[in-house]
Amino acid sequence: GSEMCIRDSGKAGQNLSFNQKKALESSKLTGITFMNTKKRFYPNGLFAPHLVGFAEMNSKTKQIEGQLGAEKVFNSYLQGDFGKTEFNKDIWGTLIPDSTRITSPQKGGDISLTLDKNIQYYTENALDHLDKLYEPKSSFAYVVDAKTGEILAGAQRPAFNPKTREGFGASWVNALYQQQIEPGSTFKVFGLAAAIEEGVYERDKTYMSGHRTIGNHTIYDWNQTGWGQITYNEGLQHSSNVLMMRLQDEVGTDKMKMYYDQFGFGKPTGGLYNGEIKGQVPWEKEIQKKTTAFGQTITVTPAQMLKGMTSIVNDGEMLKPYYVKKIEDEHSVLFKAKPETEKSPISKETSEKTRRELTDVVNGNAAGENPYKLEEYKLAGKTGTAQVLDEENGGYVEGNYQYLTSFIGYAPVSYTHL
């Protein structure tokens, strides 16, 4: 007699292109059977892959299943249902009349994201340019609509191509909400806002910059010498650590912690994310409290920084950043996002005053040749440089890639939108 052997070629025989199929057919190899399957296409290539994610066929269930990003979070909406036919038979295998029950297949839903295609492509290209210019270990950039909380763009490097999966092994973590960093001086924005809210920030008041002793530790301004006796406004433009510690004292250490909590640090943003981390706000030792004033010791996610910044940019109303606009199937709209406002620790007046100071940080005389000072377009914000946390061994990274340099800001100043 003869025997028939069936062999599954595994992934090597999956996801064939039309041209590959035609080539196999023309080769006239025997024993090859082709099966139609569903497949998700990603025609935009490297386009917010960590937010969009990707899906692939589950060989056991024969269903396309989301593996990352929106594809994974909203898999149940996207997947649909094969449908089925059920019936009863008697003991002789005869179909029992009127016992057939048919469940029609359900088409998967559609998800609309908040991403702006033009801004997203620009952001992707900007990170590519930055990579070539500075060769950083990693980078990220996000753009949020200040009036709604919609994430208009989100990119990071290293990245992966969702179509080919090239680069995926080294870059599956979503920097927006799964990567905690010590933010450095960009965090000073929130201490400044708290000091203005409490009425202790007087822009023309003077103090002695340079250094300050906390217990057995001496903390210096970033240039190690300071700038002598300067105003609070000048200290902010120079990004003085001594100024921020002074403002923390004037607000009150524990009250400042309350402001950090209300800005949303140390807890998840509550966005529709998968595996969001909350960061940490250590507050046991005096040195931890003081270094938090200028963005060291504390760890945050970019999502938290963006959320807190909306309260400053949006007249004291804090918005939750989100990237899913709506979900709908062929029958109805299943979900439609709307701006979610949370209680902000600052007033509209404080928001306006904080923006005035941040405008000076970029455009003021003491700021010097700030790279964010543009002739044709006026923006405001705060730069930051922080030591990179070594999450595996504790302490800070040594050698190459010791520092995280960043900027958080908004534009245009005349009508704040992004």
Please place each PLM-identified region on the residue numbering.
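Flexible glycine-/small-residue-rich
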Residues: 53-55, 115, 145, 381
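Conserved, well-ordered alpha-helix/loop/beta-strand core segments that scaffold catalytic motifs
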Residues: 96-139
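Short loop/turn microsegments at loop-to-beta-strand junctions
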Residues: 138-141, 375
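Small/polar-residue-rich segments within soluble enzyme cores
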Residues: 7-108
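Conserved small/polar residues in nucleotide/adenosyl-binding loops
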Residues: 1-9, 416-417
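Loop/turn elements at helix/coil->beta-strand transitions in domains of secreted/extracellular proteins
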Residues: 137, 415-418
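Amphipathic, well-packed alpha-helical segments that form the structural scaffold of globular domains
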Residues: 79-82, 93, 112, 124-128, ...
